[in-house]
Amino acid sequence: MKLHLHPLSLVFFFFFFFFRPTMSSNQHDYSDALSKSILFFEGQRSGYLPNDQRMTWRRNSGLSDGWTHNIDLTGGYYDAGDNVKFNFPMAFTTTMLAWSVIEFGEFMPSSELRNSLVALRWSSNYLLKSVSQLPNRIFVQVGDPIADHNCWERPEDMDTPRTAYAVNAPNPASEVAGETTAALSAASIAFRSSDPGYSQTLLQNAVKTFQFADMYRGAYSSNDDIKNDVCPFYCDFNGFQDELLWGAAWLRKATGDESYLNYIESNREPFGANDNVDEFGWDNKVGGLNVLVSKEVIEGNMYNLEAYKASAESFMCSLVPESSGPHVEYTSAGLLYKPGGSQLQHATTISFLLLVYAQYLSRSSLSLNCGTLTVPPDYLRRLAKKQVDYILGNNPMGLSYMVGYGERYPKRIHHRGSSLPSIVDHPEAIRCKDGSVYFNSTEPNPNVLIGAVVGGPGEDDMYDDDRSDFRKSEPTTYINAPFVGVLAYFAANPGSS
């Protein structure tokens, strides 16, 4: 006999898991958080800033990027609190911004949908530049990370080498090219109605980028010419095969082409997509891949892809504490926890997948089957909402982990531009080591990076507002990007539970 997971039958469980005494139960302003989560990206911009730049303490930077290769590589985003443009996580950021618009754009106010598309275009434009010399060359990074991380200076003052790192055929860069394929494909869908010409350009470049990724299979971090500069920052720890499947899946979604359907069907097992199904982030795409492809099974009756749906359901069930089988770990206060730093990247990406899968199930009037449990879509939304509310302040610290949201939030984040005096207030350059005094200061950052979500607390739910503890205090673009979609949903459905 199946146990149906409904509030009336599990009152005690829901009360204990979702309303623990350590939590505040304040209602959050998800619309405000949504606006700020998008605004954050303006603080990460590289290149020439537009006249309507809202994060006004920032100025132009990285204006010579690409000149050593006689190519314009200006634009894009700095990944985190440094001044390097790492294409691997930037492409993932782009994919997730686009997916946020695709799945949840309908829930956004028109002004925030516009702002989301502006944020998306800022990175997709840069990625187009990075693949402009295909079929023989792809650019994967701009900025010497060793030199950059040895300095504490504003992006506007950068005097460290702005090395442009290229991978030339037949050397491989499958993980970066595969993720860039996904990013350009997803962006092409996001822009399809508002800018069809640009959408087509994105898609054409996605196709040729995938050809490079698949023809020259292998990891860019195994390339002797660049591996010491991409590792240990954004090494390919999980293998490149998941990015090939991920890129093909997005091309399938963008084109409807049967060849990509055949690719993801025939390569699932050879590429190991049945492993590590409970992971999703800038390095491991398997969790997101399974959810994305599941839509074809749930809504399109493509039962030849049933294995992807089975893995997606296994992942979803691992998030349900009452289900049998392996579970992901939660902190005592209910935050999704995985070993390593920057915990909130897991909370935002997995919350995104929970909401997307709940949407797929709801549209087909289905529930999730976890052994003897039948889990309705609203339960998945409840799990996601708990993560969101934790991030926004319902946690033992009583602290919002989004900068600028709520009354209490991190003031000493690990971020060069935010922690140094702005070029508006201090026009003179602050050179490499001269910024150390600001890094070591216990004073709050002078420039508020509104909307930035920091790495977050440890397994004990504790957080020290310490600039030097980058694992906890550093924001990243790939923490925020999926959070845009999550917040869009709850801004429109604040009572969803």
From Swiss-Prot:
Glycans are attached at residue 440. It is found in: Secreted. The keyword Lipid biosynthesis does not apply. InterPro entries: 6-hairpin_glycosidase_sf (IPR008928), 6hp_glycosidase-like_sf (IPR012341), Glyco_hydro_9 (IPR001701), Glyco_hydro_9_Asp/Glu_AS (IPR033126), Glyco_hydro_9_His_AS (IPR018221). One of its GO terms (molecular function) is cellulase activity. GO terms for biological process: cellulose catabolic process; fruit dehiscence; fruit valve development; plant-type cell wall loosening. This is Endoglucanase 24. It comes from Arabidopsis thaliana (Mouse-ear cress).
